[in-house]
Amino acid sequence: MAYTSKHGVDDMVMLTSISNDAINDNLKKRFAADLIYTYIGHVLISVNPYKQINNLYTERTLKDYRGKYRYELPPHVYALADDMYRTMLSESEDQCVIISGESGAGKTEASKKIMQYIAAVSGATGDVMRVKDVILEAFGNAKTIRNNNSSRFGKYMEIQFDLKGDPVGGRISNYLLEKSRVVYQTNGERNFHIFYQLLAARARRPEAKFGLQTPDYYFYLNQGKTYTVDGMDDNQEFQDTWNAMKVIGFTAEEQHEIFRLVTAILYLGNVQFVDDGKGGSTIADSRPVAVETALLYRTITTGEQGRGRSSVYSCPQDPLGAIYSRDALSKALYSRMFDYIIQRVNDAMYIDDPEALTTGILDIYGFEIFGKNGFEQLCINFVNEKLQQIFIQLTLKAEQEEYGAEGIQWENIDYFNNKICCDLIEEKRPPGLMTILDDVCNFPKGTDDKFREKLLGAFPTHAHLAATSQPDEFVIKHYAGDVVYNVDGFCDKNKDLLFKDLIGLAECTSSTFFAGLFPEAKEVATSKKKPTTAGFKIKESINILVATLSKCTPHYIRCIKPNEKKAANAFNNSLVLHQVKYLGLLENVRIRRAGYAYRQSYDKFFYRYRVVCPKTWSGWNGDMVSGAEAILNHVGMSLGKEYQKGKTKIFIRQPESVFSLEELRDRTVFSYANKIQRFLRKTAMRKYYYEVKKGGNDALVNKKERRRLSLERPFKTDYINYRQNFKLKDCIGDKGTEKVLFADLCNNLDKSFWGSKVERRIMVLTSNAMFLVAIDPNKDKIEKKVKPFLYVLKRRIDFNKIGSITLSPLQDNFMLISVNGEHSNLLECRRKTELIGVLLKHNPSVRIQFADTFNVTLKGGKTCVVKFIRDPQGGDGKVKGTKVSVAPGLPPSSAPNIQAPQETSGGASFTVAEQSYKDQILGAKGGGGGGGRGRGGPSPSGAVSPRPSPGGGGGGPSPFGGRPSPSGPPAAASAPGPEQARALYDFAAENPDELTFNEGAVVTVINKSNPDWWEGELNGQRGVFPASYVELIPRAAAPAPGPSGGPRPAPPGGKSGRAAPMGGPGPMRGRGGPAPGGPGRGGAPPPGAGRAGPPGGRGMPAPGGAAPRGRGAPPPGAGGPPGGGRGGAPPPGGMRGRGGPGPAPPGGMARGGMMPPRGRAGPPPPGM
């Protein structure tokens, strides 16, 4: 993390001076440099810039923060989102982010950026997740004096993920919708956006036509005298809202009913009342109104129904009472409609999966202090007090209490705990503000003044409650400052009641949607249950929220508003300093500097990081405490200075130490995963090439004469480097992204029978088609200097159009590609066997047929007959007119010895006799001494063994001339003693095939072909063990070289060389003749070639470096059994190269395979 003085520090824990002024100054420096994000440990501080900052939220920036640790890049909301997402996946724990701050501080924008990041890194989130914000903002946001798009409700958004980290669902919980905004707005503010969107679209969309007028016509909209918002097109916003509702799943009928209800609320607000002169009221407009009776009269029931006498009275209301009823109905309609919309969104998103991981984002409008603060402000500020209490509990109080409980040395730091203020509002015993208000509301004569009197009487000396000089006000000292509340309307708003006659309207409507908003309408007449108050509902919902947040790993964003004017580049020192103080940033910095950045229980720490330490990764027998200590000691952390051990947890002081530990774990896990991946890929490739080889050769055996080179040629798919040839890919076009199965050069002979030249073609076989591409000279005089040739696609043949492939029964390379309904192609391809094998592997329906006469279909429908004749002088195929002369080849029964990959049980790896893919690519690269590669005669069953390559040979003369290798049996090398190793650590076997030993034990090494797991013997017990747990014990050198005929000694001080080719002198690597049992690399080593190694291993050099590593078969008693790995002779008729694998130990593996994916791998080398 970069720390600079010019633009402040990234993490305020690093401030040299710790004070509120220093924090304020650092934020100001960073704000001036457009660095709006700053850390306090893991807490992110965000200052609203009120402008767009270049490159702050680009796609490139998002990618930069993906998968990075927090300290690697400057502070950003993306870094917090990435940490939250990765922690959820790595720890399998639910996460949440609590975004707090004043209105206009940028809380909603921060939540959007977190959602944007999670959507980008976790894959497609679905259309519902994408459009939900459009609906929520339309119905829940409004323009305020401080914010043009202020959320007027609190929401907790939960995103559900599967174990892979892909989003699968979500849920929204809403809190404290500002219902009063429906009926009243202060000057300069607007009602909810949806009202203005509907009115703006009325002229263009038929679904918005409900006899609507302009906004200034409606009483519920004209009080704020503001109808538009800069930068907001209400007509386009309505279009987006309409489309979003369709995506969510709202039917056309539902949408119509919702917008009809929005219209009804507007017209309901225009209903005005006048005094009727009789103590009641009447509607000023004489036009009929359906709710007239409900608004003008109150239905009062005396007595208890069902218990004796009761009376029902219809009492007229005065204009004020009628207006109150009108507004109460309007607020109830909008509030219930909003809840319905939230529920429909949840129905479309939520999945009921207890295994799903969740990430929650809490965005709730911030602390409010207005000129006149009423019941709504009290509720909002109470919620913010509770959120501040959560922050204190989890970051300040709980941290210090945990140090004490764990026995960690710690000096307590004082901080303001706002629990006393929360108790003042919500406590039941002694009764707090909400409880007192509920008590007053339960009495018929309860009034606002009575509530104030009882409140001040209950807390005459409370430190956070005081009276004012005004008889209708009181003061609460919140954490964010002192707020004066006016009690006017407290009781009515707390009752939050709709009179029964208003609820009864739902039974009179023909709209099922309207009736569904009031499910209690049918029971209202008989229900005896006392309705809950608004205060009770707020306490209940916020306590549920607190419980939900407490189950998650919390993350925090503290949003700060730099000025009251929403102006860019304006930083109000006093305003920001006030927020710094009440947010408790100073205490947060002090505790963070003195505390520990990371703490975790011993068991979780051990199981997460044991992979980084060889002692703990494989076979740890100690307890979790000592295991955690071993891990930290291994990475070089010192006890006391960098970490401390608590009673149940480990504590690490610096976050950089944790990041380093996490990086080391990532590298180690990647290394092991890479080994497993290589093994699986290698196994898959071996199986694939076996099937291709077998399929191609089976299609030709007994049907076509063979060429020796064709039998021994390795398969490697791409012979033209297609994958790196981007110009060729461009020529093929959009098909260049298909998987390439085969690519090679070939000759196209369609016109050669008329004297034309043979056309050279590039053949590319993909998973869908065959492409034939010509290489033509560039005729552009200027361009050809840079691009002398061009690729031209001549033909694309889809697999499903290939009718058949015809070959002759002779040894030539010609093949006729017959295409259904089109002209055919006569091609000459040297690697026809591989091509046919690939075709049959991916398209088994292709017919392979053989004939000595080809009927070639030319372009234009003409045909031509091509005949193949046997001619000793014909070679691989000489074309003359329409005749092709071919020399005799190997018998049609000739076939290579192809052995299938063998699969061992017990979790061991596959072992194969054929060469690996790498060996195939290396192909016929020579190099061998003493006659080169050992090759035997033909294999049994008529299989033809590959012939030697130039410079190589087996026992017997080389067909390319040169001196034959010495005849006669080779001299036997002296057998070395058994190889031994000393145990460095204790190892306890967890599987039946493993060998247990203690530190210092001497193990006889039997097989160390697997670099990670060796096979050994101890006290008569045989098994495998981690190679890194032992060190080899040097053993005595082998006897001096025997008689001449072996490799030439190296010059003094020089490296041991290779034996001379064909057995002659020279610094070549010695290879003996073939061992009994068949062809393969080496057999018994020449005399003096060095002693043999362990079974299946490499031979050891002779003393003084006189001989190279011999790869001959070990002498009797020293080497492995025939076919037992390197040095041993391969099975009869085996492939060239390394010998076949020897028998693997139980649960182990043979030489040449990779480490099997055991339940636990051996420890990595030190320093990994």
Curated annotation (Swiss-Prot):
<feature type="domain" description="SH3">
    <location>
        <begin position="976"/>
        <end position="1035"/>
    </location>
</feature>
<dbReference type="GO" id="GO:0000146">
    <property type="term" value="F:microfilament motor activity"/>
</dbReference>
<dbReference type="GO" id="GO:0006897">
    <property type="term" value="P:endocytosis"/>
</dbReference>
<comment type="function">
    <text>Myosin is a protein that binds to F-actin and has ATPase activity that is activated by F-actin.</text>
</comment>
<keyword id="KW-0067">ATP-binding</keyword>
<feature type="domain" description="Myosin motor">
    <location>
        <begin position="7"/>
        <end position="666"/>
    </location>
</feature>
<feature type="compositionally biased region" description="Polar residues">
    <location>
        <begin position="895"/>
        <end position="909"/>
    </location>
</feature>
<dbReference type="InterPro" id="IPR036961">
    <property type="entry name" value="Kinesin_motor_dom_sf"/>
</dbReference>
<keyword id="KW-0597">Phosphoprotein</keyword>
<keyword id="KW-0009">Actin-binding</keyword>
<feature type="compositionally biased region" description="Gly residues">
    <location>
        <begin position="1090"/>
        <end position="1099"/>
    </location>
</feature>
<dbReference type="Pfam" id="PF14604">
    <property type="entry name" value="SH3_9"/>
</dbReference>
<dbReference type="GO" id="GO:0022607">
    <property type="term" value="P:cellular component assembly"/>
</dbReference>
<keyword id="KW-0505">Motor protein</keyword>
<keyword id="KW-0518">Myosin</keyword>
<feature type="compositionally biased region" description="Pro residues">
    <location>
        <begin position="1040"/>
        <end position="1052"/>
    </location>
</feature>
<feature type="compositionally biased region" description="Low complexity">
    <location>
        <begin position="1100"/>
        <end position="1112"/>
    </location>
</feature>
<dbReference type="GO" id="GO:0120025">
    <property type="term" value="C:plasma membrane bounded cell projection"/>
</dbReference>
<dbReference type="GO" id="GO:0031252">
    <property type="term" value="C:cell leading edge"/>
</dbReference>
<dbReference type="InterPro" id="IPR027417">
    <property type="entry name" value="P-loop_NTPase"/>
</dbReference>
<dbReference type="GO" id="GO:0005737">
    <property type="term" value="C:cytoplasm"/>
</dbReference>
<dbReference type="Pfam" id="PF00063">
    <property type="entry name" value="Myosin_head"/>
</dbReference>
<dbReference type="Pfam" id="PF06017">
    <property type="entry name" value="Myosin_TH1"/>
</dbReference>
<keyword id="KW-0728">SH3 domain</keyword>
<feature type="compositionally biased region" description="Low complexity">
    <location>
        <begin position="960"/>
        <end position="978"/>
    </location>
</feature>
<dbReference type="InterPro" id="IPR010926">
    <property type="entry name" value="Myosin_TH1"/>
</dbReference>
<feature type="region of interest" description="Actin-binding">
    <location>
        <begin position="542"/>
        <end position="564"/>
    </location>
</feature>
<feature type="region of interest" description="Disordered">
    <location>
        <begin position="876"/>
        <end position="909"/>
    </location>
</feature>
<feature type="domain" description="TH1">
    <location>
        <begin position="704"/>
        <end position="892"/>
    </location>
</feature>
<dbReference type="InterPro" id="IPR036072">
    <property type="entry name" value="MYSc_Myo1"/>
</dbReference>
<feature type="compositionally biased region" description="Gly residues">
    <location>
        <begin position="1063"/>
        <end position="1083"/>
    </location>
</feature>
<feature type="compositionally biased region" description="Gly residues">
    <location>
        <begin position="950"/>
        <end position="959"/>
    </location>
</feature>
<dbReference type="GO" id="GO:0005524">
    <property type="term" value="F:ATP binding"/>
</dbReference>
<feature type="region of interest" description="Disordered">
    <location>
        <begin position="921"/>
        <end position="978"/>
    </location>
</feature>
<feature type="compositionally biased region" description="Gly residues">
    <location>
        <begin position="1120"/>
        <end position="1141"/>
    </location>
</feature>
<feature type="region of interest" description="Disordered">
    <location>
        <begin position="1036"/>
        <end position="1168"/>
    </location>
</feature>
<dbReference type="InterPro" id="IPR001452">
    <property type="entry name" value="SH3_domain"/>
</dbReference>
<comment type="similarity">
    <text>Belongs to the TRAFAC class myosin-kinesin ATPase superfamily. Myosin family.</text>
</comment>
<dbReference type="GO" id="GO:0051015">
    <property type="term" value="F:actin filament binding"/>
</dbReference>
<dbReference type="GO" id="GO:0007015">
    <property type="term" value="P:actin filament organization"/>
</dbReference>
<feature type="compositionally biased region" description="Low complexity">
    <location>
        <begin position="1152"/>
        <end position="1161"/>
    </location>
</feature>
<comment type="subunit">
    <text>Myosin I heavy chain is single-headed. Dimer of a heavy and a light chain. Inability to self-assemble into filaments.</text>
</comment>
